[in-house]
Amino acid sequence: MAEGLVLKGTMRAHTDMVTAIATPIDNSDTIVSASRDKSIIVWKLTKDDKSYGVRQRRLTGHSHFVEDVVLSSDGQFALSGSWDGELRLWDLAAGVSTRRFVGHTKDVLSVAFSLDNRQIVSASRDRTIKLWNTLGECKYTISEGGEGHRDWVSCVRFSPNTLQPTIVSASCDKTVKVWNLSNCKLRSTLAGHTGYVSTVAVSPDGSLCASGGKDGVVLLWDLAEGKKLYSLEANSVIHALCFTPNRYWLCAATEQGIKIWDLESKTVVEDLKVDLKAEAEKSDGSGTAATKRKVIYCTSLNWSADGSTLFSGYTDGVIRVWGIGRY
């Protein structure tokens, strides 16, 4: 009996591409998603056959695409970044935005919370990385002039390594940069990609970093040493990456499917593709010609904290939920 991923169900409420999915660290039944429909949806997971989750709340306030969303470690707040140039902090219980973070001069592409939730980092098309406190005050800006990126900053993440507080950023300038959080100084520039880098992920123990983008290659880096370890061929543009919390796996959302590698053997263990015809038949009993023609792909990914469930957001606004199963 092999272990693999099977489609458990779908979640439908967004009307445009799902740009980000945030899952709680306590494995509770609430997840949050962001979309180009300018909204954030708070979902209650029901795990039903027809619908894996139901919409609890739609959070609105951003005036343009919402590009990223993350959850605070207590699961009470969500933080979002939008093409309207702002970040917003949301009180999920009240369903309201409690704070706006204004300072970027162009689209915000990525946001992240530090492990203790006391610091916030954001990345933008204005080529800067900003560090904020939770009051919405910008404490530091890493800009293009000095050691900063020379093009759009597409993704930014905190490392979970508390001994060496670190920020990792990816950019359209084809580099990944590693920053000391204590003084916002550059620790290393990771060069190796031949096209823009759209996503970066840090392993659960903070030792590894994976990056991907236009060139269709995932590069794995040793964060402490600042050196390249190896590469994995996705052979398709990469939109999102995430490590599995309890297995030595890395997942990539590509334009040709979701690829999952076992990092020990460096082999592909899964290549998940959507069967739109079967999906249509399951939901309404009819597979239309239009359904078969539509090309969709995954743009966002996140695992449940226990590593049993993979949530994937697609260009058609649907969240597809994959579960570990035996077959």
UniProtKB/Swiss-Prot annotation:
This is Small ribosomal subunit protein RACK1. The keyword Protein transport does not apply. One of its GO terms (molecular function) is ribosome binding. Belongs to the WD repeat G protein beta family. Ribosomal protein RACK1 subfamily. Keywords: Repeat, Ribonucleoprotein, Ribosomal protein, WD repeat. Pfam families: WD40. It comes from the Eukaryota. WD repeats lie at residues 13-44, 61-91, 103-133, 148-180, 192-222, 233-262, 293-323. InterPro entries: G-protein_beta_WD-40_rep, RACK1-like, WD40/YVTN_repeat-like_dom_sf, WD40_repeat_CS, WD40_repeat_dom_sf, WD40_rpt. PROSITE patterns: WD_REPEATS_1, WD_REPEATS_2, WD_REPEATS_REGION. GO terms for cellular component: ribonucleoprotein complex; ribosome.
